[in-house]
Amino acid sequence: MAQSVADVMKLVKENDVKFVDFRFTDTKGKEQHVSVPTSHFDDDKFESGHAFDGSSIAGWKGIEASDMLLMPDSNTAFIDPFYEEPTLVLTCDVVEPSDGKGYDRDPRSIAKRAEAYLKSTGLGDTAFFGPEPEFFIFDGVTWNVDMQGCFVKVHSEEAPWSSGKEFEHGNSGHRPGKKGGYFPVAPIDTFQDMRSEMCLILESLGIPVEVHHHEVAGQGQNEIGTRFSTLVQRADWTQLQKYVIQNVAHTYGKTATFMPKPIVGDNGSGMHVHQSVWKDGQNLFAGNGYAGLSEFALYYIGGIIKHARALNAITNPGTNSYKRLVPGFEAPVKLAYSARNRSASIRIPYVANPKGRRIETRFPDPLMNPYLGFSALLMAGLDGVMNKIHPGEAADKNLYDLPPEEDAKIPTVCNSLDQSLEYLDNDREFLTRGGVFSNSMLDAYIELKMEEVTRFRMTTHPVEFEMYYSL
């Protein structure tokens, strides 16, 4: 990746680039793009930006005030590895043309404001994030929703239901089975080469890869672990990681999804988020307390637990998210913390070096907009530090198997998107500090997500026929 405007212009020349792709992320977390020929691109674009219609993005401006600017970040430049014509990609901030400031609903601008807010508090100067997005790769998927009815069909040769099927190339018989994907070698793991190609492309684009493997679900669930980084850069990387994964799968004739729960009866996909806060080169999470944590880290955990249900609206932003957040599928529903205990929603991983001390928030999923999610987690944690919110005693036991009287004492994450949106509506002050999230943005976000809730509520489901048709 390039570092300066001069580097970018050099990339364009050396690679005979034909188009420049300006990319930005919408509220829901989907990257959008517009391409311009290099004949209409010069270094002035980094000062003047590229105009576009903001009213076309759900939850953004109305048509009466829709002019917006895409302001490219030269540090994000790379040559797209999938386009046939040589194309330079630039990640952009969305700014107001009237004053050049970041648009209050632009996720990347929100992430930048979160980083600035951390510094302004004097509590720390750098927040590191390390997400672990899991994903499924299917051979194909078909669905339809209309007045006649609805259906979805997942096609996966690796899935247990394919053991009795005939395939043109034969049926190898080697399959992981339900919850058996973590993690036998090939030929049971059929995605080794595809994941390796994804990793090589990620590294060529400047994202360090640490590990890749099959995940638990036996229908093509996978994970590629990449390195942590600062808030905005790590959010940029997460968007690029999803882009590479989906496009490599596409070149193989497969389809990759980051839906949290596409399969009934097997594990869903999470996106655990590792976090730490530093100041003057020192890890503020390292200390002499429980599991080597500092008081700062414990208060940070306390803030996340206190605001977890409001956070769910951002970290688990789909109706499908809450089909994952149920007991029995390794989903972290209990709002507790523990060292190495994966049944707690916040885990403190073992590290040999205090520099690596961090916490792992386990309830987020890969539908999460990384710019919004990382920012919200940071704001919740900082609220805990500023208000000295202690999380209580650690939960060093299996939270999936507690006696009823103990189980009732431990709070849980939300059980639906609409519940989480209600919590967000009533618990938002920690997000609006320093102007990081605006009330206008949160109102628009809640309205946008309630449209999803309403659509889901109004759609008759096949399970309802199974339960009620003959009564």
From Swiss-Prot:
InterPro entries: Gln_synt_N (IPR008147), Gln_synt_N_sf (IPR036651), Gln_synth/guanido_kin_cat_dom (IPR014746), Gln_synth_cat_dom (IPR008146), Gln_synth_gly_rich_site (IPR027303), Gln_synth_I (IPR004809), Gln_synth_I_adenylation_site (IPR001637), Gln_synth_N_conserv_site (IPR027302). It catalyses: 3-hydroxyaminophenol = aminohydroquinone. Its EC number is 5.4.4.3. Residues 15-100 form the GS beta-grasp domain. SMART domains: Gln-synt_C (SM01230). Optimum pH is 6.5. Is inhibited by H(2)O(2). 1,10-phenanthroline inhibits the activity slightly, but other metal cation chelators such as EDTA or tiron have no effect on the activity. Divalent metal cations and hydroxylamine have also no effect on the activity. Due to the relationship of the protein with glutamine synthetases, glutamate and glutamine were tested as inhibitors; neither preincubation of the compounds with the enzyme nor their addition to the assay buffer affected 3HAP mutase activity. One of its GO terms (cellular component) is membrane. Optimum temperature is above 30 degrees Celsius. Heating to 60 degrees Celsius for 1 minute abolishes 72% of the original mutase activity, and no activity remains after 8 minutes. Residues 107-471 form the GS catalytic domain. Keywords: Isomerase. One of its GO terms (biological process) is benzene-containing compound metabolic process. 3HAP mutase requires neither a cofactor nor oxygen for the enzymatic reaction. This indicates that the enzyme catalyzes a Bamberger-type rearrangement. Belongs to the glutamine synthetase family. Catalyzes the isomerization of 3-hydroxylaminophenol (3HAP) to aminohydroquinone, a step in the degradative pathway of 3-nitrophenol. The enzymatic reaction is regiospecific since it leads to the formation of aminohydroquinone exclusively, without producing the isomeric 4-aminocatechol. Can also isomerize other hydroxylaminoaromatic compounds, such as hydroxylaminobenzene to a mixture of 2-aminophenol and 4-aminophenol, 4-hydroxylaminotoluene to 6-amino-m-cresol, and 2-chloro-5-hydroxylaminophenol to 2-amino-5-chlorohydroquinone. Does not act on 4-hydroxylaminobenzoate. NCBIfam families: GlnA. This is 3-hydroxylaminophenol mutase. It comes from Cupriavidus pinatubonensis (strain JMP 134 / LMG 1197) (Cupriavidus necator (strain JMP 134)).
